[in-house]
Regions:
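Glycine-centered, phosphate/nucleic-acid-interacting loop/turn motifs that mediate DNA/RNA or nucleotide
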Residues: 45
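Arg/Lys-rich, alpha-helical DNA-contact motif
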Residues: 1-24, 29, 48-49, 61-135
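Conserved active-site tyrosine of GNAT-family acetyltransferases
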Residues: 41, 59
Length: 135
């Protein structure tokens, strides 16, 4: 784990950590998201990651949780622009929960419709497998 320094924080001695966190390679290994993608998320404003004194990104639990949630949203085919809109609202803080809720509910409806389509397609595949004597 590497120490993170925050702007305006008092300098710490070599053994005194301002904050512990994980480097980009460790987060990539934990989340399955490539370092390139993690950097991309930062560039497009989805992820703001503090840096240590040497300029390396240091991910805390909040950043890791965000990466995991972004990954789940992407798995459901939520467009990047919608994920950006959601996290813009989150980053603005309290007062826009209704907008966040509406965005997530709309996406949930899209996901449920897609699941229904996939279940129908799976049924057709299962039928063909049974036709050929498979199980």
């Amino acid at each position: 784990m590497t120490a993170v320094t925050h702007p305006g924080a008092a300098p710490t001695s070599a053994g005194e950590d301002a904050r512990e966190g994980l480097g980009i390679a460790e987060v990539a290994a934990i989340t399955g998201v490539t370092p390139h993608t993690l950097r991309y998320y930062g560039r497009i404003g989805l992820l703001s990651v503090p840096r240590d004194a040497a300029g390396r990104r240091i991910y805390g639990q909040a950043e890791i949780n965000r990466v995991v949630f972004i990954t789940r949203l992407r798995l459901t085919a939520m467009p990047i622009r919608d994920i950006q809109a959601y996290f813009r609202l989150v980053d603005e803080g309290p007062g826009n929960e209704d907008e966040r809720l509406a965005l997530l509910e709309a996406h949930r409806d899209t996901v449920k419709a897609r699941i229904t389509e996939l279940e129908s397609a799976l049924g057709a595949i299962e039928f063909k497998i049974a036709t050929y004597g498979g199980s």
